[in-house]
Curated annotation (Swiss-Prot):
<protein>
    <recommendedName>
        <fullName>CMT1A duplicated region transcript 4 protein homolog</fullName>
    </recommendedName>
</protein>
<dbReference type="Pfam" id="PF15213">
    <property type="entry name" value="CDRT4"/>
</dbReference>
<feature type="region of interest" description="Disordered">
    <location>
        <begin position="65"/>
        <end position="94"/>
    </location>
</feature>
<dbReference type="InterPro" id="IPR029185">
    <property type="entry name" value="CDRT4"/>
</dbReference>
Length: 164
């Protein structure tokens, strides 16, 4: 009994903390470190601001298009009128009947966009990768090429190895 009482008195004097076992007087002198990093670099802050501004701009354009769509006609009735330009470059343009904006399918003619036959390949119009992932976008880039998969070697004849 006396041992337990002495032990309790000793514990009350020291007052250990429950997580790391340091005395309270040491913890009061030093501020605890945060469990995670709270510093954000200025470059990351600028990128976050640009991203928020871009999202806000997209939301505003969507709201404006909804307002205009409700006033004139439903969005399902919007049609694109296709017309060939008189240029010999072969670019095709689309004209939106409502907003009179022009979109070029071919984009600027570059050597990288030219196909093997000399005809330019169309550049894909893509506004937001989260909205519609495609085969050419949202690819995962690995640091190393995956290892070659080989069939296990067996001691049998080659004709027996590949029989299904």
């Amino acid at each position: 009994m006396e041992r337990l009482d002495a032990r309790k008195m000793k514990m009350e004097e020291v007052e250990l903390t429950e997580n790391i076992g340091l005395p309270v007087n040491l913890l009061e002198k030093h501020d605890p470190w945060p469990a995670y990093v709270t510093y954000t670099s200025p470059m990351v802050k600028r990128l976050i601001e640009k991203s928020k501004a871009r999202e806000l701009e997209c939301l505003q354009t969507v709201e404006e298009s909804r307002r205009v769509g409700k006033q004139s006609k439903p969005a399902s009735l919007i049609q694109l009128k296709r017309r060939k330009s008189s240029k010999s470059s072969g670019t095709t343009t689309f004209k939106d009947l409502r907003s009179e904006t022009m979109l070029s399918v071919w984009g600027p003619l570059t050597m990288s966009a030219m196909g093997p036959s000399g005809v330019p390949e169309p550049l894909h119009l893509h506004s937001d990768s989260r909205a519609s992932p495609t085969a050419s976008y949202n690819k995962i880039i690995f640091a190393r090429a995956p290892t070659m998969r080989t069939l296990p070697y067996t001691a049998g004849r080659p004709s027996e190895m590949f029989c299904i």
